[in-house]
Amino acid sequence: MDMRRASMCMMLICVSLVLLSGFGQFVICSEEKGTYNDNVVKMKLGGFSDSKNDWNGGKEIDDIALFAVQEHNRRENAVLELARVLKATEQVVAGKLYRLTLEVIEAGEKKIYEAKVWVKPWMNFKQLQEFKNIIPSFTISDLGFKPDGNGFDWRSVSTNNPEVQEAAKHAMKSLQQKSNSLFPYKLIDIILARAKVVEERVKFELLLKLERGNKLEKFMVEVMKDQTGKYE
């Protein structure tokens, strides 16, 4: 009887160990699976956001923009010349996908193009994925002549328009030059924008939200731009 009881005890111990081992593996697998899912969530791709690089004169963005124009010229046997980068946004992929709004010179005329460039810095890899001409939201000719006693009527324009954003940057710099504060202005938002034509020049009226130090301020500004692209 004692031998039989001892055998039964040993069998129960073995079964218990097997069950515990299986449960432990299940827990480990579950934890690993949970960790894997967490990593997947962390790596989910987001939308485009403003580039962290300085796109107003930043060397990295300028290099990517120049690559886009040169690659387009090579593919299409074109002779476009990069003038400047108007806007740069980026999206995290396997590397980064840059979306650039470019001002280029084509046959002596300024035109706006949008380029998408895929970059993997660790592989020294760049690929032009898209390069297309963008028709501006408005020009002097298509604003239309609407006499109101003073010339042209005001027209509401998109705050995302590259021309509006350039005018806002110019206005912010002008405010900074006139300011005696040690804190520089930072453009937070273009709240409203409208434009009209005055003697072959575009006049912008913008409501800007600016940050200076810890203080938010709103400014209504007017900016003039002539046909050569010069601001007043």
From Swiss-Prot:
Residues 46-135, 152-214 form the Cystatin domain. The modification Phosphoserine is found at S181. GO terms for cellular component: extracellular region. It holds the Pfam family SQAPI. The keyword Repeat applies. A motif (Secondary area of contact) lies at residues 91-95. Keywords: Phosphoprotein, Plant defense, Protease inhibitor, Repeat, Secreted, Signal, Thiol protease inhibitor. One of its GO terms (molecular function) is cysteine-type endopeptidase inhibitor activity. The record marks G46 as: Reactive site. One of its GO terms (biological process) is defense response. Disulfide bonds: none annotated. InterPro entries: Cystatin (IPR027214), Cystatin_dom (IPR000010), Cystatin_sf (IPR046350), Prot_inh_cystat_CS (IPR018073). Belongs to the cystatin family. Phytocystatin subfamily. This is Cysteine proteinase inhibitor 7. It comes from Arabidopsis thaliana. The lineage of its organism: Eukaryota, Viridiplantae, Streptophyta, Embryophyta, Tracheophyta. The gene is CYS7.
